[in-house]
From Swiss-Prot:
It catalyses: 6-hydroxymethyl-7,8-dihydropterin + ATP = (7,8-dihydropterin-6-yl)methyl diphosphate + AMP + H(+); (7,8-dihydropterin-6-yl)methyl diphosphate + 4-aminobenzoate = 7,8-dihydropteroate + diphosphate. GO terms for molecular function: 2-amino-4-hydroxy-6-hydroxymethyldihydropteridine diphosphokinase activity; ATP binding; dihydropteroate synthase activity; kinase activity; metal ion binding. It comes from the Bacteria. It is an enzyme of class 2 (transferase). Keywords: ATP-binding, Folate biosynthesis, Kinase, Magnesium, Metal-binding, Multifunctional enzyme, Nucleotide-binding, Transferase. In the C-terminal section; belongs to the DHPS family. InterPro entries: DHP_synth-like (IPR045031), DHP_synth_dom (IPR006390), Dihydropteroate_synth-like_sf (IPR011005), Hppk (IPR000550), Hppk_sf (IPR035907), Pterin-binding_dom (IPR000489). GO terms for biological process: folic acid biosynthetic process; tetrahydrofolate biosynthetic process. This is Folate synthesis bifunctional protein. Residues 1-166 are annotated as: HPPK. Its cofactor is Mg(2+). (7,8-dihydropterin-6-yl)methyl diphosphate binds at residues 227, 267, 287, 358, 395, 429-431. It comes from Chlamydia muridarum (strain MoPn / Nigg).
Amino acid sequence: MTTWNFVCLGLGSNLGNRHEYIKRAYESLKKAGIRNLKSSVILETKALLLEGSPKEWDLPYFNCVAIGETQLSPDELVKEIKMIENRLSRDSSLKWGPRSIDIDVLLYGDESYSCCSERCIIPHPRLLERPFLLSMMASLCPYRYFRLRGSPYDGKTFAELAAIYPLTEKDVLGSFAPTTQIMGIVNVTDDSISDTGLFLEAKRAAAHAERLFAEGASIIDLGAQATNPRVRDLGSVEQEWERLEPVLQILAESWKDAKQYPDVSIDTFRPEVIRRAIQVFPIRWINDVSGGSLEMAHLAKDLGLRLLINHSCSLPPRPDCVLSYEESPVTQMLRWGESQLETFAQIGLDTSWQVVFDPGIGFGKTPVQSMQLMEGVAKFKHILKCPVLIGHSRKSCLSLLGRFSSQDRDWETIGCSVALHNQGVDYLRVHQVEGNRRVLAAAAWSGMPV
C-alpha cells in the first residue's frame, strides 16, 4: 500500500498578480494529489539577486510555505511541480530572474529523510539562508526537527531555528492572508454613499486605484454608476462610459509596462460598457450587480473574463423589495445561486473558478438578513463549489452595531472581514484596503487550509 508522506513546500511569485498566481499554484498542487494542504501567511520580501543582476529583476516577492501530504516520491513531486510552473507561465530560462511562480520542495518524509539527486536536494540547500522561510515554517510545524548530518543545526526545531535566524522588520515589506484576496473599490460617481464625488475626476480615480493596489488589493473594481438605495435615476450607457473611459485610459498608460499589477474589474450591469472597456484596457472581471444576465454571461465566456454575480432584488435597492421573512436568507441565496450556476454551466462557463458568487449584502436584504448572510459563507462554498465574494464594506447593516456615518464604519467592516476570512471567503470587496489586509494577515499567521 502506498504511504502518505509529509511535504513542506516554498512558493514565491514576483510577476503579474502575485496573489492570484499563488492561489492557482495551490489549486494545481491539490489536483496533483497533495492532501491536507495548509498555507502560512504570505510575506512580501525583497528579491534575492546575484551580484550584477539586471536592475529590472529587483521586484518584491510574495513568499509562503505550505505543508501537506503526498504519495509521490520526491522526484515525481518535482516533476509535477515543474509542469505546474510551466502551466502558470514560469520562464525557467533565466536563473534567479523574475518568475510568475516558483515552487521548491523544502522538506519531505520523516525528519530523518534526506536526498541529493539530479532533480532535488532535501532539505533544501538554502533553507537556513532564508529567515522568512524559517519564520513561516515555525508557524506551521514549530516542533519538527531539522535534520542534516554534519550541520551545527542538526536536531534543532524550527521554532529554535526561527529564533537563531530571526525575521526582522526590515525583512518584511508586507503580509497577506493566503486564502482571502482583497478587491479595492473605486467609485467614479457623484452619488456614492461612502465617498460622494471624491473620485469623479479621472486622474483622482486612477491615482486612487494605484494607491489601493500599493496597499495590497489584488483586484481593483471600477464603477461609474451608483446603485445604492438613494439613487433614483440609473443614468445612461453614455454617461457611465463618459466617466469610466478616461480612468481606463490613464491606467492603461500607467500599467502598460508594469511587471506587477492587479486584476481590473468593471462594476456594471450593462454589457455595452464591458464591450467598450475591453477595447481600452485588459480587464479581467465583470462585476454584475444585476446578478448575471445571460447576455453578460455569454460576454464573459467569449472574452474569457471572470463573472461576479451579485444578487439584488431590485436596482436600485428598495426597502419594500427584500427577501422573504419566512425562510432563512442563506437558504434563499443558495437556491438562487444553484439556479444561476446551472444556467452558466450550460452555456460553457467553468463555474469552479470563472463565476464568483456574491449574495449581495444590502441589495434587497434587511440589516438582519445581511448579517445572517455573512454567517453563511462556509455553507455557500461547500454547496455551490465556486469562489465566494462578500461586499460588506461600510454597508448600512453595520448600523446594527452603532450609529456611525458610512465613512466611519471601517472598524466594523474589518471585524466582519476577520469572521468572513475564518469561514474561508475567497474575496472581500472593501474601501479601506490596508487595514483589512493587515488584520487578515495577522489572523492567518498560524496558517490556513487551502
